[in-house]
Structure formats: C-alpha cells, structure tokens
C-alpha cells in the first residue's frame, strides 16, 4: 500500500503560491500587440503612399540617377540646382500649375529644356543624349492649347538660345542656324533635334578654341594678327578638318581640329613669316568667322 502524500502546512502553501510567476491575462497581451503593430504598418504604408502620390519617390530616384550619370564635382550644389529647376512646371502633370500666359509657358519650357541640355558636356555621349531626350520631351509635351510634338519655331528658338548663351558672336553662328533650322510649322523629330543641339554645342567649343588660338597669333598691343600668319593657320586647320570627311558626327570634326599639332602649326607659321612683303592685319572677328565657316561647311543642312 503506497504512502499518501503528507499535506503541507498552510504557511508553506502560501510561500509556494508567492513564488509562482504571475501570468498576464491571455486576453489582453495579444490584442494590444496586434493593434500597435498594425497601426505602425498602416502609418508606414500611408506615408509611403503619400510620397508616391506626390511623385517625391520618383523625383528623388531620378535625381540620384542623374548624379550617378553625370558625376558632378559638387553633388550637393548640383542637387540644389536640380531641385530648384524642378519647381518649373513638369510636362507630365497634365496642365496643373499652368501659368496664365502662353508666352510665359513657352519660355518656361525653353528654360527647362536648356537647363537639361547643359547638365552634361557633349563629350559625355550617353548622358548628353539622355538629356537631349528629356529636353525634347519638355518641349513636345501637350498643353491646353498645344498639341503634342515639337514644331520648327520652338526648335529654332532653342537653337538661338543655346548659341546666344554660349557667348559666340551672332555673325559667327548665323550660317549654322540657317543650315539646321526648320520651318515654323514643320514637325521636328528627335533625330534632327539631337543633331541640331549637338552641332550648336560643338560649334561653340570650336569657336572658343579658335579664339584661344588667335590669342597666340595676335599682337597684344594692337589686338590683331598678321594676315599671312592667320591665313596659314586657317589653311592648316582646314587640312586637319578634311581628314574627318568620312565622319558623320560633328564631334569628329572637333577632334580633328584638336589634332592640329604644334609641328604642323610651326611649319605654317614659318611659311607665313618667310614672306617679305608687309601684310595687312586680320581682326579677331574675321578669324573666328573664317574658322567657324570651316566647321559649318561640314554640317549637313536639314531637309
């Protein structure tokens, strides 16, 4: 017969009960936990949806991609300028925030397109082409009184803005504009738009290099160069450009001009200096016009 357990005294029973861990009611903890988690998830989802609906998420993503694409020396200043220009009316927001004047809207479109075109140097081929496409979309967007697409009038106005802001004399760039402009009501496809913008930017750099070259030739006291020397340099430059006749891109002519080495230039200067008769001077404007004409002659006209 097994021995029965001896019951504990009341005082020991009370001590054992005190040592048992207290258990929270099962009905309270799970409900409060689920409520707090669900509220946090709902708040996070609501904030994310809010940013997505405003376009902030996509805007930040586009800004960071642009920094990676261009790799500016001062990324913070670049981003500040980027977001400042984002304040202009976006071409995809369907007319929201459209200014009262159609002319003002057109100027905003041109300013926005011009800003995109300047983000990357034309030598950064991929980044430049991407920015050209964005600029084309800015100008091609439809509005309340504008059909989608880019017309020749807007395209020609942007070409003039690029050249004017580039600092080149009007008489120097005018022959190029006459070759690549379109008629006012003519539809301008992206390919022509890209070639026209690239031609303008390359010409501006070409003229800047020609100006630096003229500084080496000119008499500091008179700000003119000997005509024989200037013409000899232009003839040598023309020969360097002729080597790029098989190239189709305007940048190839710029590269050909940069191959105007010191040896060829020195020989041209020696030949010019060997003449004994006095020569009339050549002004800077004339030299730049003739140098630009060498490049413009290689550009194919539109149409």
From Swiss-Prot:
Organism of this sequence: Mus musculus
Biological process, per Gene Ontology: adult behavior; chemical synaptic transmission; sperm axoneme assembly; vesicle localization
Pfam families per record: TPGS1_C (PF24480)
GO MF annotation: an example: tubulin binding
Protein name per Swiss-Prot or TrEMBL: Tubulin polyglutamylase complex subunit 1
Domain of life: Eukaryota
Gene: Tpgs1
Keywords attached to this entry: Cell projection, Cilium, Cytoplasm, Cytoskeleton, Developmental protein, Differentiation, Flagellum, Microtubule, Phosphoprotein, Spermatogenesis
Tissues where this protein is expressed: Broadly expressed at low levels. Highly expressed in brain. Present in brain neurons (at protein level).
One annotated Gene Ontology cellular component of this protein: motile cilium
Mutant lacking the gene: phenotype: Male mice are sterile due to defects in the development of the spermatid flagellum. They have reduced body fat content and fail to attack each other when caged together with other males.
Phosphoserine: modified positions: 46, 279
Location (main, coarse): cytoplasm
